UniProtKB/Swiss-Prot annotation:
Catalysed transformations (reactions): L-citrulline + L-aspartate + ATP = 2-(N(omega)-L-arginino)succinate + AMP + diphosphate + H(+)
Chain sites annotated for binding ATP: A10, Y11, S12, G13, G14, L15, D16, T17, S18, A37, G118
Subunit structure: Homotetramer.
Name of protein: Argininosuccinate synthase
Family, per entry: Belongs to the argininosuccinate synthase family. Type 1 subfamily.
Length: 405
């Protein structure tokens, strides 16, 4: 890629991407534009500006994407009750298509002919970033330094930084032993002692949540208001999508909700252990299923459940911008037209317990479902014909002597 003149770098301001910035300048003799996304990771993003300026960067983008992230990515995903391999709420996966989108937008705005990222050659993120980039700008060049250079250890990165006067602190506050990624939906932990699947995670690793043992001894009740499948208010107070998720993170974290320790199957072929804190997302998943339980038609609900694992895999594997994901999203969104109402939850020591749900669009009819006298709302004699018709094929097979036991 000797013809690269300008590169947009997804830049955090940390060691890896600061080294990448200088490496791009030296290796490709190109201009670098930095892009730093505020996705609600809870850290200051402005220091990235000073670091980029110190390395001679002239065009610096620092964007607050919190509302767009939750509104256009997290909320649509939760309309599908999305969960990967039965446990993972896709906190890292769902952030990558937005970052890829913004990288391409900035490349178009600045006339850059390439983008670059700090994802390693072992992980899923390289796939997610690049699939998104190619979908949105087919001819874009992608530079992935971890697949090119020989700086394959933290010590080598530190040595490179010192040699090139990159402003990175070698000493100071103790560095976390984990590789972490955070946004408004979750925080993840990988590496360190977690690479031994038998070793228990350390209590002081967790940053967002209290342990269930340390959570309050009295439950917290909340009410979530839904419109078209999305939460629009907490306890009657209207909030934006990002405000909703931030508040649910706070409440859930206080009550020890949302911790997860799993081994997942990466798209690149290996198994990887990760620990996650997703307090708000854990509450959202439980509540959304509760409001759907009274507002969705049975067959629509079952079809959504059948398609959800495919939808989850598309997001996990980086196919957010694919035609099949977009097609599924249209179906999912259409199913949410009547998913309106209020869900009441009890939060207690790591548990999310549904205690009530109500909706003007509810399909629950107490007159039909009652165990008491229903006044003829449901004719129980109709069940006999229903059962016989459903048994017909099995009765025919049995009549032909087919043995079942």
């Amino acid at each position: 890629m000797a013809d690269v003149k300008k590169v947009v770098l997804a830049y955090s301001g940390g060691l890896d991407t600061s080294v990448i910035l200088k490496w791009l300048q030296d290796t490709y003799n190109c201009e670098v534009v930095t892009f730093t996304a505020d996705l609600g990771q809870g850290e200051e993003v402005e220091p990235a500006r000073a670091k980029a300026q110190a390395l001679g960067v002239k065009e610096i983008y620092i964007d607050d994407l919190r509302e767009e992230f939750v509104r256009d990515f997290v909320y649509p995903m939760f309309r599908a009750n999305t969960i990967y391999e039965g446990e993972y709420l896709l906190g890292t996966s769902i952030a990558r298509p937005l970052i890829a989108k913004r990288l391409i937008e900035i490349a178009n705005e600045t006339g850059a002919d390439a983008i670059s990222h700090g994802a390693t050659g072992k992980g899923n993120d390289q796939v997610r970033f690049e699939l998104g980039a190619y979908a949105l700008k087919p001819g874009v060049k992608v530079i992935a330094p971890w697949r090119e250079w020989d700086l394959l250890s933290r010590e080598k990165l530190m040595d490179y930084a010192e040699k090139h006067a990159i402003p990175i602190e070698r000493h100071g506050k103790k560095k976390s032993p984990y590789s972490m990624d955070a946004n408004l939906l979750h925080i993840s932990y990988e590496g360190g002692v977690l690479e031994d699947t038998w070793t228990e995670h350390e209590e002081d690793m967790w940053r967002w949540t209290k342990s269930p043992e340390a959570a309050p001894d009295t439950p917290t009740y909340i009410e979530l208001t839904y419109q078209a499948g999305d939460i629009v208010a907490i306890d009657g107070k209207a909030m934006t999508p990002a405000q909703v998720l931030a508040e649910l993170n706070r409440i859930g974290g206080e009550n020890g909700i949302g911790r997860l320790d799993i081994v997942e199957n990466r798209y690149v072929g290996m198994k990887s252990r990760g620990c996650y804190e997703t307090p708000g997302g854990t509450i959202m998943l439980k509540a959304h299923r509760a409001i759907e339980s009274i507002t969705l038609d049975r067959e629509v609900a079952h079809l959504k459940d059948e398609l959800m694992p495919k939808y989850a895999s598309l997001i996990y594997n980086g196919f957010w911008w694919s035609p099949e994901r977009l097609m599924l999203q249209q179906m999912i969104d259409a199913s949410q037209a009547n998913v309106n109402g209020v869900v009441r939850l009890k939060l207690y020591k790591g548990n999310v317990i549904v205690t009530g749900r109500k909706s003007d669009d509810s399909l629950f009819d107490a007159n039909i479902a009652t165990f008491e006298e229903d006044g003829g709302a449901y004719n129980q004699q109709d069940a006999a014909g229903f059962i016989k018709l459903n048994a017909l094929r099995m009765r025919i097979a049995a009549g032909k002597g087919r043995k079942l036991i």
